[in-house]
């Protein structure tokens, strides 16, 4: 029986990549800086002391980090990672961006080698011609925002006006994204989704290569209690080249079970079943449940988004550390479900250093940890592209070769 469990710890970078200077990210180090803050008791909100992740250590995260940075994680010693059970290494990104879509597509063997379209202006971010087309087609009373913003902050600033006027809040960031925030009840979730779908069509028709249109629903009655809900939806471009998931379905009649926002990231392409799940607790338990029932030629593919969206972007070191420790506590259950012949792969899609300036992603190397009971444990080295993961999975399932990447086994 052949099964792959592919876990994306969204934003768990392990040190700035060689090209980080091009992104003003030299020195960024998501895992390293979290461990440092924990070690010096500067991340003690709802937790205390050094970062406690024994199961990630067992899979080789400390060795992976050390090989990426040349440094040792503060708060850990060499004895702790002496009994590693998985092969470990790290990878640099080939794609031109440091965003969710680029990272995930590349992991699946389809790197994005062109340039995304970015809305670079901090104010009046979206071209007036584009806004006019959207307003006209959707018969909107107007829009609010039209700027770079933090999603949690802009609803505090404009949420009340949005409720009064019915104007959706448009905003973006340094990533290739078009985000729309609307009140889930007053405006309506289905109306928000419909707007996002239409904007995706307009962008595609007008040759804007924008990675994602993101619905950002929120609830509350005023700026003091507005909160985003779990009903976010990402409407992505479709991958520009074939992924290992498509090959598995086409060549082996296999199944790809997408958990969390995975299906949205790939625009539903190469996905057999989409399971909606939000929050770290629910994502962990849904993943464990699906692992228990996974059949032959199946991939269980989960994105643990909270590391990025809840703690990374919000620069919450304590929250990120606490999240890692919770995930680690559930990781032991996942490891116990991996049988001989299975592949359990843990990696990330980019960095989002919670100690870094601003609120954006950081260009970093990512860990590659591969656990397969009974297989030889080895150092996987420095991989030049995340696509080595996709190629490894393709070879494991005896699929035709991917265009990008080299198998690690």
From Swiss-Prot:
Reported cofactor(s): Mn(2+)
InterPro entries: Alkaline_phosphatase_core_sf, DeoB, Metalloenzyme, Phosphopentomutase_DeoB_cap_sf
Catalytic activity line of the entry: 2-deoxy-alpha-D-ribose 1-phosphate = 2-deoxy-D-ribose 5-phosphate; alpha-D-ribose 1-phosphate = D-ribose 5-phosphate
One Gene Ontology term of the molecular function aspect: magnesium ion binding
Pfam families: Metalloenzyme
Localization per record: Cytoplasm
GO biological process: 2-deoxyribose 1-phosphate catabolic process; 5-phosphoribose 1-diphosphate biosynthetic process; metabolic compound salvage; nucleotide metabolic process
Protein origin, superkingdom: Bacteria
CDD domains the record matches: PPM (cd16009)
Keyword Cell inner membrane applies: no
Keywords: Cytoplasm, Isomerase, Manganese, Metal-binding
NCBIfam families in UniProt: deoB, PRK05362.1
Family, per entry: Belongs to the phosphopentomutase family.
Name listed for the protein in its UniProt record: Phosphopentomutase
Organismal lineage: Bacteria, Pseudomonadati, Pseudomonadota, Gammaproteobacteria, Enterobacterales
Gene: deoB
